[in-house]
């Protein structure tokens, strides 16, 4: 019962992010004289967050989704450079920190086979987590192709960092760095389940000491049965 309560508490907190985005970007659409490019971008963000919200609600309904075998995935081909830009723009507009949130890549586009909603859920989890521990400075989402041909995503912040002794357990269920920070400590655990199902890996960069850096790799093609 305690685990279910913690799960529901965490999901309630995560649901606030897409809800705030929907409210904020819907308001932008009502701005007089809004240009077409901004209108299209707002519509894209609203659609992405509507899909994310639906997935989160489904997770709340099915608490057993903490078991990767029960998580539902829809694998299709998606362009992820634009996805990253939209996620960063969304969070930059609703952030509760003075830290800058930015996206860095040398890629103009990159298509991968993934579940777009689940990938967005991972990116949002990692970026929102960074805002909790980074009151000033910067939070950077980066995307590149690594030496093995995987898409490598990283979220780097200039916050308080993660003690070395906690880095091996931080992806466990209900693990929290700071008990005073809202949430049940399931966000990173869910990220690990998602990326494992998508054929990748996630880890903490222990060599980065100016804050925290989370890195995950994602294959360009899926080998799993759809």
Go through each PLM region and give its residues:
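Helix-loop junction within the histidine kinase core
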Residues: 64-75
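Short alpha-helical Gxxx[C/S/T] motif in the catalytic ATP-binding
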Residues: 187, 191
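Short helix-loop "hinge" at the ATP-lid/N-box region of the Bergerat-fold HATPase_c
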Residues: 130-131
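Short alpha-helical segment of the dimerization/phosphotransfer core of two-component systems
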Residues: 48-53
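Primarily the dimerization/phosphotransfer
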Residues: 1-31
């Amino acid at each position: 019962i305690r685990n279910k309560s913690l799960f529901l508490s965490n999901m309630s907190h995560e649901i606030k992010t897409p809800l705030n985005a929907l409210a904020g970007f819907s308001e932008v659409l009502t701005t007089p004289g809004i240009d077409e490019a901004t209108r299209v971008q707002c519509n894209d963000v609203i659609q992405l967050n509507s899909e994310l919200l639906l997935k989160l609600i489904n997770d709340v309904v099915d608490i057993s989704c903490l078991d990767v075998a029960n998580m539902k995935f829809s694998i299709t081909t998606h362009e992820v450079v634009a996805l990253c830009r939209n996620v960063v723009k969304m969070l930059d507009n609703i952030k509760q920190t003075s830290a800058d949130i930015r996206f860095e890549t040398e890629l103009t586009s990159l298509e991968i086979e993934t579940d777009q909603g689940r990938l967005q859920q991972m990116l949002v989890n990692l970026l929102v987590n960074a805002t909790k521990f980074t009151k000033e400075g910067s939070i950077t989402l980066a995307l590149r192709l690594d030496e093995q041909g995987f898409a490598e995503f990283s979220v780097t912040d200039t916050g308080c960092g993660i003690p070395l002794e906690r880095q091996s357990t931080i992806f466990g269920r209900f693990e929290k760095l700071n008990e005073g920070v809202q949430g049940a400590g399931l966000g990173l655990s869910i990220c690990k389940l998602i990326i494992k199902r998508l054929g990748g890996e996630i880890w903490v960069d222990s060599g980065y000491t100016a804050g925290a850096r989370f890195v995950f790799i994602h294959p360009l093609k899926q080998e799993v049965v759809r």
